[in-house]
Curated annotation (Swiss-Prot):
PANTHER family per UniProt: HL01030P-RELATED, PHD FINGER PROTEIN 10
Location of the protein in the cell: Nucleus
Residue ranges, compositional bias (Low complexity): 284-293, 314-331
Keywords: Metal-binding, Neurogenesis, Nucleus, Repeat, Transcription, Transcription regulation, Zinc, Zinc-finger
GO cellular component: npBAF complex
Full protein name: PHD finger protein 10
Species of origin: Danio rerio (Zebrafish)
Phylogenetic classification of the source organism: Eukaryota, Metazoa, Chordata, Craniata, Vertebrata
Homology family: Belongs to the SAYP family.
Keyword Transcription in record: yes
Length: 490
């Protein structure tokens, strides 16, 4: 709070001895050897002049905080709050405010702004003709907080009082309007009361629905001021039945070897890959990830271990093939031909899935009203205009004419003996994986797909290539070999 000025010496009796002695001492000390001024008795006129002199000696005139005005310009929603530099400098007691605080943002008042302040009784008509300067209100408040805390405290009290008066005025106006309504109540017809109730309920329902929709769409997350955490609604999730989440007496093992009820249940298909020492299948590849090339592994493993384990491998494969050959003919799907690696060179020891085997009595898929994917025609006519039956993929809905796919009659007959796959669905017969399409080659007799590294080849061979399954069915080379050996023996 600003200090209240003490009574000036001129307000006391001029004839007071203390005052007169001070006057005499000043006159005696001011003499510098010249003729001393004559003493005069202080009259009424002298007291007024002495009062003005003492006022200037004590300091600048007091500017009350009530006169410090903060206004908004422009008055609309886009306006900002300002203060007049002349009022601020007079309130803070700063003579040259601009030179002392040159870094503050300031601007000159426009003519419209001066007229607005004149209407608000902030400035006088004389001040309208002068050049006035506006300062940003927030910068002035920050300056008072840092360098003039007493002035800021005094101004804060005034602001609180103004806010209290504004709230009281608004409350009085609202109370007066309510009283007027109570004195003059509206007359409602009794027959229209149910209609008004329905309208009110409808309006309330619309408000609640709009409020909930706005809260879910625009205010789903909120900032917690106490924990400084952004709270987000929890997502919906499915709840398991109680019997699935009920814990037993041994939920988890606390020491090694202790029994626990939580363990993984493997399906029969998964057990074929476990345990490692008696696994029937190789570890499967993840369809979502690219398979690793096994060219180098197959080449190095075949070259280094072929000589050392040739006899043992041949005996194992021969014994396994004799038993597995019978199981293939009988149609038992749970048996697998061999445990050899995909890169091992053994025609009889390559594991193959049942979908690539020629199953006796297999019937190909029948799709009515199928259309060829190449010529976009049905079985009534192919690209040459002749009727031709279509072949269908066993995995998808693709179909095609054999002539459009450049397939021979023998190849079509072979395809109808097993679940044939189109180019988009083609998988390797050995590893059952669709990866490494650049290393995939196809048999010219049955159109089955094989990876080069799965059959022990470095690259795709040139010319015609026949897979192991089709080479078993070809009996001509075997007869020639049998006829040659007796001739040599003779």
């Amino acid at each position: 709070m600003a200090a209240v000025l003490s009574p000036r010496p001129c307000d006391s009796n001029p004839a007071t001895p203390g005052t007169q002695s001070i006057k005499d001492d000043i006159e005696e000390n001011s003499s510098d050897g010249s003729q001393a001024p004559k003493r005069r008795r202080m009259g009424s006129g002298d007291s007024s002049r002495s009062c003005d002199t003492s006022t200037h000696e004590l300091g600048p005139t007091y500017f009350p905080a009530e006169n410090l005005t903060e206004y908004k310009w422009p008055p609309d929603d886009t306006g900002e709050y300002y203060m007049l530099q002349e009022q601020v400098s007079e309130y803070l007691g700063v003579t040259s405010f601009k030179r002392k605080y040159p870094e503050m943002e300031r601007r000159d008042l426009s003519h419209k702004e001066k007229l607005y302040l004149r209407e608000q009784n902030v400035i006088t008509e004389t001040q309208c003709t002068l050049g006035l300067t506006a300062l940003r209100s927030d910068e002035v408040i920050d300056l008072m907080i840092k360098e003039y805390p007493a002035k800021h405290a005094e101004y804060s009290v005034i602001l609180q009082e103004r806010e209290r008066q504004r709230i009281t005025k608004e409350y009085n106006v609202s109370t007066l309007s309510v009283q007027m309504q109570q004195q003059n109540p509206q007359k409602v017809e009794a027959s229209k009361v149910p209609e008004y109730i329905k309208k009110a309920a409808k309006k309330a329902a619309e408000f609640n629905s709009n409020f909930n929709r706005e809260r879910m769409e625009e205010r789903r997350a909120y900032f917690d001021l106490q924990t400084h955490i952004i709270q987000v609604p929890q997502g919906k999730y499915k709840i398991l039945p109680p019997e699935r989440t009920k814990t037993g007496p041994f939920p988890v093992a606390l020491i090694p070897g202790q029994f626990q009820e939580y363990y993984k249940r493997y399906s029969p298909n998964e057990l074929r890959y476990l345990p490692l020492n008696t696994a029937l299948f190789e570890p499967p590849l993840d369809p979502e990830l690219p398979a690793l090339d096994s060219d180098g592994d197959s080449d190095d493993g075949d070259d280094g271990k072929e000589d050392g384990k040739k006899n043992k491998g041949s005996s194992d494969s021969s014994s396994g093939n004799t038993s597995d050959g019978d199981s293939q003919d009988s149609g038992i799907h749970s048996k697998v031909k061999s445990k050899d690696r995909p890169g091992a060179q053994g025609k009889d020891g390559t594991p193959r899935s049942i979908q690539h085997k020629s199953v006796p009595g297999y019937k190909p898929k029948v799709i009515p009203n199928a259309i060829c994917g190449i010529c976009q025609k049905g079985k009534e006519a192919n690209k040459r205009g002749k009727p031709e039956a279509l072949i269908h993929c066993s995995q998808c809905q693709n179909s095609g004419h054999p002539s459009c796919l450049d397939m021979s009659v023998d190849l079509v007959a072979k395809i109808k003996m097993y679940p044939w796959q189109c180019m988009e669905c083609k998988t390797c017969t050995v590893c059952q994986q669709p990866h490494h399409e650049e290393e995939m080659m196809f048999c010219d007799k049955c159109d089955r797909g094989f990876h080069t590294f799965c059959v022990g080849m470095d690259s795709i061979p040139m010319g015609c290539w026949v897979c192991d399954l089709c080479s078993k069915d070809i009996s001509t080379p075997q007869k020639k070999g049998q006829t040659k050996t007796p001739k040599k023996a003779k």
